[in-house]
Amino acid sequence: MSNAITMGIFWHLIGAASAACFYAPFKKVKKWSWETMWSVGGIVSWIILPWAISALLLPNFWAYYSSFSLSTLLPVFLFGAMWGIGNINYGLTMRYLGMSMGIGIAIGITLIVGTLMTPIINGNFDVLLNTEGGRMTLLGVLVALIGVGIVTRAGQLKERKMGIKAEEFNLKKGLVLAVMCGIFSAGMSFAMNAAKPMHEAAAALGVDPLYVALPSYVIIMGGGAIINLGFCFIRLAKVKDLSLKADFSLAKPLIIHNVLLSALGGLMWYLQFFFYAWGHARIPAQYDYISWMLHMSFYVLCGGIVGLVLKEWNNAGRRPVTVLSLGCVVIIVAANIVGIGMAN
């Protein structure tokens, strides 16, 4: 396995670790509605950071974006919006299925759809089937899916042992939302594929290869921001128990406390895709679809590890922790299989 591939896998792991931890600061926010908290964090992660970093990277910010036709920018934006819809459905999936089943189904589907649809759309899937390296990377995807399934099973055992139930269990509604979440969340993978002309243009301007994907985030995350912020603002305006004005009428120290924590959560959320771009840059071009598989499987892996570190599994008993550990090992094996396949 080459150093470039190893570093690509490593950066995807770092990004996934940030994704697994990003909600921790949000949990410290006090006396704010979820919608206000999510909006403040989202403005930081989807608008401020993508624009600021792109402005630093590009020699001429406006000239870069105006150089693309609408036919190039629109698919990137729409796939970003598609991914934004997946974000909203993710929370609803947890509500109706519970954390373990919801994560297992949603992440499993988005891993498959986001990973395999890209080579299918590009007409490269038969090449993967007919080459040794391609077949090995596909085997790695399958093993990763098995690992996600094992971690999901560990979560179910934990919930059963600790008496944790879904907020409002509804299998039919939850499954529909989980499938929708899985499909729509893959929009980020599709957006990155559609944004290749933007990456190439950034490289032509002298942007370091590690950073060429970052300017495209202005468009991708702009699409996601409109969906997420629109959802939050509509709820803040229509739901009687929610009030943006009330949330910002608290004591000034508490408002500052909440804004800083929400901004920190937004920063950590953005960093997952900052390092995703670094990892994506190190993956061989013919296997770039693997970036999504690595990100999603490492997200599940890091989520399990973070749960252990935060002692969320302390009262779950030995069996759930053993199953979780097995799932984490399987995901690590999957990453190695994919790495060897890409090296071939």
Swiss-Prot record:
Protein's recorded name: L-rhamnose-proton symporter
Ranges that cross the membrane: 4-24, 38-58, 68-88, 101-121, 137-157, 175-195, 214-234, 259-279, 290-310, 323-343
Name of the gene this protein is made from: rhaT
Task of the protein: Uptake of L-rhamnose across the cytoplasmic membrane with the concomitant transport of protons into the cell (symport system).
Gene Ontology molecular function terms on file: rhamnose transmembrane transporter activity; symporter activity
Reaction it catalyzes: L-rhamnopyranose(in) + H(+)(in) = L-rhamnopyranose(out) + H(+)(out)
Cited Pfam families: RhaT
The keyword Zinc belongs to this UniProt entry's keyword annotation: no
HAMAP family (UniProt xref): RhaT (MF_01532)
Keyword tags: Cell inner membrane, Cell membrane, Membrane, Sugar transport, Symport, Transmembrane, Transmembrane helix, Transport
Lineage: Bacteria, Pseudomonadati, Pseudomonadota, Gammaproteobacteria, Enterobacterales
Membrane topology field: Multi-pass membrane protein
Disulfide cysteine pairs (residue numbers): none
Protein localization: Cell inner membrane
GO cellular component, one term: plasma membrane
Family of this protein: Belongs to the L-rhamnose transporter (TC 2.A.7.6) family.
InterPro entries in the cross-refs: L-rhamnose-proton_sym_RhaT (IPR004673)
Source taxon at top rank: Bacteria
